[in-house]
Regions:
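Conserved acidic, metal-coordinating active-site core of Asp-based
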Residues: 134, 138-141, 145-258
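Short active-site oxyanion
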Residues: 74-78, 97-99, 194-196, 253-254, ...
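Mg2+-dependent phosphoryl-transfer enzymes with acidic/Ser/Thr/Gly-rich catalytic loops
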Residues: 39-43, 60, 228-311
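Residue-level signal for inorganic ion chemistry
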Residues: 70, 81, 105, 196, ...
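Short, acidic loop-to-helix structural element flanking the phosphoryl-transfer center
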Residues: 57-73, 120-127, 179-181, 234-246, ...
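Active-site phosphate-binding/coordination module
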Residues: 61-165
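Asp-based phosphoryl-transfer active-site loop
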Residues: 42-55
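Short, Lys/Arg-enriched N-terminal segments with co-localized hydrophobic residues
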Residues: 17-37
Length: 311
């Protein structure tokens, strides 16, 4: 197979043109590998941190223009993020042309146009309690996501830099529902938890936590800083995309996903076209079809212009 093409899984007759924007028949009879054009990509999904957001946690003018141009051309633009709904509020107006959020690493699907939750998956109560008990013995900030909202201890939110999350200080001050003792609150009045983040004070603490909980039936991802992201078993950005594509009646091979980190790996592997940011982890670049510029040089705009809209 020529570089730039990959076989469409389960098919002998079609390839994905990873350097263009469609699915093509092999055209064996006339010797034309590209063959007959079959369909265009209809949906593009962006991770937030490290992808559509630059190092200053803002969206550049060029990237925003590309998002809006894609929407005007009738393409679906979505977010594929570990963030919850409340953590995305500050971007709601600027990203008005984003139709859906696959948020909380796939545990919650949100209709941004109608501002409604379409689907969610929650962690079993006994698993949440086991994780809380384990975390109680370490210097770790427990950060829960429930019904699209964030909850954490007020004392820890006041010093996020201690947990290597200082870049999010202003956001957490603004959006987190703060309590004195989140573990005690949960045990007294259990509430649905879609996702549970553990922000550790050091990488060693994260390793100890991981060794103690890795046997639990959870989806566990290493994330930025010294954090762990815990989701319901078999829930990921990939499962979220599958659910949303079913809801929107868009085949997976007509999707483009852009990402940079470990929690993007599974969804990148199932997308029609996987795009790694220039700042992506080396193994993420290896598994992707193409690599674009980094998040400080409008890699997302490049993905839109080169692979979604270019004929």
């Amino acid at each position: 197979m020529r570089k730039g093409y990959k076989k469409l899984e389960g098919s002998r007759d079609f390839v994905i043109d990873t350097l263009g924007n469609g699915v093509y028949s092999l055209g064996e009879k006339n010797g034309n590998e590209r063959g007959t054009f079959m369909s265009h990509y209809e949906l593009i999904g962006f991770d937030m941190d490290g992808t559509i957001l630059n190092s200053q946690k803002t969206i550049s003018h060029r990237t925003l223009e590309a998002v809006n141009r894609a929407a005007r051309m009738g393409k679906r633009v979505i977010l594929s993020t570990g963030r919850c709904i409340s953590e995305l509020e500050e971007f709601r107006d600027v990203l008005a042309n984003v139709s859906h959020y696959v948020c909380e690493s796939g545990a919650l699907i949100y209709d941004a146009v109608n501002q409604s939750i379409l689907h969610s998956e929650t962690l079993p109560r006994d698993l949440v309690e086991q994780v809380l008990e384990t975390a109680a013995h370490e210097d770790v900030m427990v950060y829960m996501m429930s019904k699209g909202q964030a909850l954490a201890n007020a004392s820890q939110v006041a010093d996020t830099s201690h947990y290597h999350m200082g870049v999010y200080q202003e956001m957490m001050d603004r959006v987190v529902n703060k309590t004195d003792d989140i573990a005690a609150l949960y045990r007294k009045h259990p509430f649905p938890v879609e996702k549970l983040n553990l922000f550790s004070a050091s990488a060693d603490i994260r390793e100890r936590l991981h060794s103690r909980i890795c046997g639990l039936p959870l989806a566990i991802a290493f994330a930025e800083g010294a954090s762990l992201e815990l989701s319901p078993l078999n829930v990921s950005k990939a499962s979220g995309l599958v659910w949303l594509c079913g809801h929107l009646d868009i085949p997976l091979h007509q999707t483009i996903i852009v990402g940079d980190a470990d929690n993007d790996a599974q969804v990148l592997q199932i997308a029609g076209l996987s795009v790694a940011m220039g700042n992506a982890l080396p193994h993420i670049k290896e598994l992707c079809d193409v690599v674009v510029a980094d998040n400080d040089h409008d890699g997302c705009a490049e993905a839109v212009d080169r692979y979604l809209l270019e004929a």
